[in-house]
Amino acid sequence: MLNPAAPLQLKDPSLFRQACLVGGKWVQADSGKSTPVRNPATGEVIGEVPAFGRAETRRAIEAAEAAFPAWRALLAKERSLILRRLFDLILANADDLALIMTSEQGKPLAEAKGEVVYAASFIEWFAEEGKRAYGDMIPQNQKGRRILVMKEPVGVFAAITPWNFPAAMITRKMGPGLAVGCTGIVRPASQTPFTALAIGVLAERAGLPAGVMNIITGPSGETGAELTSNPTVRKLSFTGSTEVGKVLLEQCAKSVKRVSMELGGNA
């Protein structure tokens, strides 16, 4: 049973969501089960999030797949404008995002706000860089011919993020994918889901179309297994432990996914 209200004193309480974002809708797990999230300083339960299984994760992937053609068809400038609005909204709501982050992750409020600003900078950067994914023209080994290289979005991507930087690692992975026309699924760490969900609220307000960005929560074994085995997911980005990274690499190898791995404390 989900808590009916957030105990946090936010300027905008609607940023605190105890639901997952799938296809533009805020939904619960099919089973009705949820996972409590605790304040590491006090042990107090600050809220609960849905315990998604493979079926719900599959629907998130399908939502991203359905949104992909229209999103990739937009001009890079059009995608950039949406991301710029998201950048502005993150900064405008920095105090609330910092409070959510501190409550679930435990870092000092000043550090949390610093991370929010840092997280926003990734969105700003890729909003502009997405307009410069040019491609290339390469000389051929025959006279009068050239090789044209065109850069295209890979399709649906998945991002699995850690607990220690619950905002910055999401925007660092999400920003470039969205900027170049990919659609994705974000699976935040189970200890720190509310920061990710709040960013999802702001992404909706910025005008991000339904299904372009989906945010799921639930047991890592079930959600991760679907993300790594589903052939629709063409790319996986993971930041976390070397032990878990090895498992994900092995799972992704079966469908030959593109992978980006940032493993261990010295990655």
Where are these regions (language model features)?
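Conserved NAD(P)+-binding/catalytic subdomain of aldehyde/semialdehyde dehydrogenases
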Residues: 156, 205-267
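Structural motif
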Residues: 74, 160, 187, 216-218, ...
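Glycine-rich loop-to-alpha-helix module at the N-terminal edge of alpha/beta enzyme cores
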Residues: 44-133, 144
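Short alpha-helical
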Residues: 55, 92, 96, 107, ...
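Terminal low-complexity tails and localization/encapsulation signals of metabolic enzymes
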Residues: 1-48, 81, 85, 135-160, ...
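Short loop-to-beta-strand entry elements in the cores of soluble alpha/beta enzymes
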Residues: 82, 175, 180-191, 195, ...
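Conserved small-residue-rich beta-alpha loop and adjacent elements
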Residues: 136-210
